[in-house]
A protein has these predicted regions:
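Short, acidic/turn-prone active-site loops that include or flank metal/cofactor-
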Residues: 90-93, 115-117, 138-141, 197-200
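Catalytic cores of soluble, metal-dependent hydrolases
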Residues: 183-184, 193, 201-202
Length: 215
């Protein structure tokens, strides 16, 4: 059984409170929030005021994914928003080890994300310190993209790296997740699946979350 983190990027922003309440009732394990700056990725989403508002009504831990340049500038703000996981991109951090330590020192779980074309070797020197590895199975920036199949073998390679290093990190995958791709990722060793469009575009999002969780 995998854990599920529905992505609020696919929620109805005119009725965000309603959608968060729905997720509270659901079997979702986390709420995934994507912060985009229009520089690191070609889109702008939302920032800390929205995350703070969500945290006031959310009953699930917040999984905050920063798709921005220089994410180390915002560690304290993310903490103050009530984040459980703070995820930064390896590609956006010159001093990745330092950023991971800053996140942990702030009292959050430290996570590092890799874009589809980034090799897993980028994690080699920090994997032992991580709580979570987020593998992108689409190129980040927009919801509703098609799944990149190479993510499946990437999950297996990160799983091996975690075992060899003695790390306790879990593996999360984000992008193009549905029942078919989710089953393949779970079989490969993924612990958490981020699902946006597949959940929020379904006729019964709560039932869809429950179905994903049974994979």
């Amino acid at each position: 059984m995998v854990k599920i983190a529905p992505s609020l990027l696919s929620a109805d922003f005119c009725n965000l409170g309603r959608d968060v309440e729905m997720l509270n009732r659901s079997e979702a394990d986390y709420l995934h929030l994507d912060v985009m700056d229009g520089v690191f990725v070609p889109n702008i989403s939302f920032g800390f005021p929205v995350i703070s508002a969500v945290s006031k009504i959310a009953e699930k831990p917040l999984d905050v994914h920063l798709m921005i340049v220089d994410p180390q500038r915002y560690v304290s703000q993310v903490r103050d928003c009530g984040a459980y996981y703070m995820t930064v991109h390896a590609e956006a951090c010159t001093h990745l080890h330092r950023v991971v330590q800053q996140i942990k020192s702030a009292g959050m779980k430290a996570a590092v994300s890799l874009n589809p074309a980034t090799p897993v070797v980028m994690l080699e020197e920090v994997i032992a310190d991580l709580d979570l590895v987020l593998l992108m199975s689409v190129n980040p920036g927009f919801g509703g993209q098609s799944f990149i199949p190479s993510a499946i073998s990437k999950v297996r390679r990160v799983k091996e790296m975690i075992a060899q290093s003695g790390s306790k990190a879990e593996i999360e995958v984000d992008g193009g997740v549905n029942l078919q791709t989710g089953a393949q990722l779970a079989e490969a060793g993924a612990d958490i699946l981020v699902a946006g469009s597949f959940v929020f575009s379904s006729a019964d999002p709560e039932a869809t979350i429950s179905a994903l969780r049974k994979l």
